[in-house]
């Protein structure tokens, strides 16, 4: 009996990890595009969110990325990204081009998710991103926004309502359609970006 209790105790102490199938074995491989996000359509964008601004943007945009500074003025496109995320890499030039084309009508904002600062800065430099990006080193802002996959892009109208969300890599048609929805905002229809 003592030997049996000792064996059970050892299994519990080790966390049963070697007896349980891995997460990959318990779940089928799923493409990020197949995941269903919480429906945030029509919800208000949370107030009070702020992040430390990444260094290249501090001179022009300040020390902190204060989302409230944009509330009630321009629609926003909030892109959550990481340097180690292949779809984030692929969509970066598309987002920059849209920002350059629409910066007088839409505020683009980047949120770097739990990256090493040097890696995030190298990413910004390599893809020459000029819209402001803040760093979410602890993941608290992405938790508040209920982000669970990268990249995730939120589209917020000028009334601070989330009118669109894309989990996974953006294509130009989706970016234009959801940005148009943010611009159209309170009129309840998509506008041409």
Residue ranges and their predicted role:
Residues 1-57, 192-193:
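N-terminal targeting signals for export/organelle localization
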Residues 59-61, 156-157:
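Short, acidic, Ser/Thr-enriched surface-loop or helix-capping motifs
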Residues 80-100:
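Conserved redox-active cysteine motifs that mediate thiol-disulfide chemistry
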Residues 90, 100-138, 150:
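Conserved segment of the thioredoxin-like fold in thiol-based oxidoreductases
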């Amino acid at each position: 009996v003592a030997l049996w209790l000792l064996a059970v105790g050892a299994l519990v102490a080790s966390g049963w990890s070697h007896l349980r199938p891995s997460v990959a074995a318990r779940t089928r491989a799923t493409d990020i595009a197949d995941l269903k996000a919480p429906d945030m359509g029509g919800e208000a964008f949370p107030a009070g969110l702020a992040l430390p601004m990444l260094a290249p943007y501090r001179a022009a945009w300040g020390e902190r990325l204060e989302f409230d500074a944009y509330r009630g003025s321009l629609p926003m496109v909030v892109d959550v990204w990481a340097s180690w995320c292949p779809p984030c890499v692929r969509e970066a030039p598309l987002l920059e081009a849209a920002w350059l084309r629409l910066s007088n009508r839409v505020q683009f904002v980047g949120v770097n998710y739990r990256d090493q600062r040097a890696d995030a800065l190298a990413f910004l430099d390599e893809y020459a991103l000029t819209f402001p990006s803040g760093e979410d080193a602890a993941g608290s802002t992405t938790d508040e926004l209920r982000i669970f996959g990268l990249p995730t892009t939120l589209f917020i109208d000028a009334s601070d309502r989330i009118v669109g969300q894309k989990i996974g890599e953006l294509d130009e048609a989706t970016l234009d359609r959801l940005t148009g929805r943010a611009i159209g905002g309170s009129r309840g229809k998509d506008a041409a970006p």
